[in-house]
């Protein structure tokens, strides 16, 4: 019995030592800064949404986006800032699951504000990404591998599914006088994919 307990203790120690102290501090501070910037940006976005052409739709979509974004940053900050133990392992699952919510939340304004009347593209992609996000979030509470390639592929697939509607997205953004937003979206997606590739590699960067 003692040996079993000792082995379990060593297992928990290994599971909770994925990052060294420098990496944990860097992750905690960077995601904490994301919370602060997200709250500030959220206030600005909500104010603009309320003063826009379709204020009810705009405020609702921005609220969903902020929920997804902040849930990701809050869960990651809490996870990396917590002490090793069972709580940290639970927070790790929330951290991974919240990425799905972040991706789906980011899609919401583009699908329901920009492409809501684009022949079914808006509602179709909205339904797909949110169904994927809910399923992904639930599955995140299964036992996670240290670097799950399947999980990374799911993140990238969700993020890239907008490519099937690239033409209607560009056209509707242009009609709204927001053409440059398309390139910001592409830049953000490319940055995310590059980051996902680096994350999936079993390499220490410190």
Give the residues covered by each predicted segment.
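Multi-pass alpha-helical transmembrane bundles in non-GPCR membrane proteins
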Residues: 3-205
């Amino acid at each position: 019995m003692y040996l079993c307990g000792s082995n379990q203790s060593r297992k928990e120690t290994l599971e909770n030592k994925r990052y060294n102290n420098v990496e944990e501090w860097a992750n905690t501070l960077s995601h904490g800064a994301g919370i602060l910037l997200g709250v500030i940006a959220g206030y600005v976005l909500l104010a603009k949404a309320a003063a826009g052409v379709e204020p009810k739709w705009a405020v609702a979509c921005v609220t969903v986006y902020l929920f997804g974004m902040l849930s990701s940053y809050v869960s990651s900050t809490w996870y990396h800032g917590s002490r090793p133990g069972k709580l940290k392992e639970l927070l790790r699952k929330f951290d991974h699951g919240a990425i799905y919510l972040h991706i789906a939340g980011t899609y919401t304004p583009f699908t329901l504000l920009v492409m809501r009347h684009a022949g079914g593209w808006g509602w179709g992609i909205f339904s797909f990404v949110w169904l994927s996000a809910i399923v992904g979030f639930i599955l995140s509470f299964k036992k996670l591998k240290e670097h799950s390639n399947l999980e990374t592929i799911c993140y990238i697939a969700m993020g890239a599914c907008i490519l099937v509607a690239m033409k209607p997205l560009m056209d509707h953004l242009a009609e709204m006088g927001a053409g440059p937003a398309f390139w910001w979206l592409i830049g953000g997606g490319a940055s995310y994919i590059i980051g996902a590739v680096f994350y999936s590699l079993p390499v220490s960067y410190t």
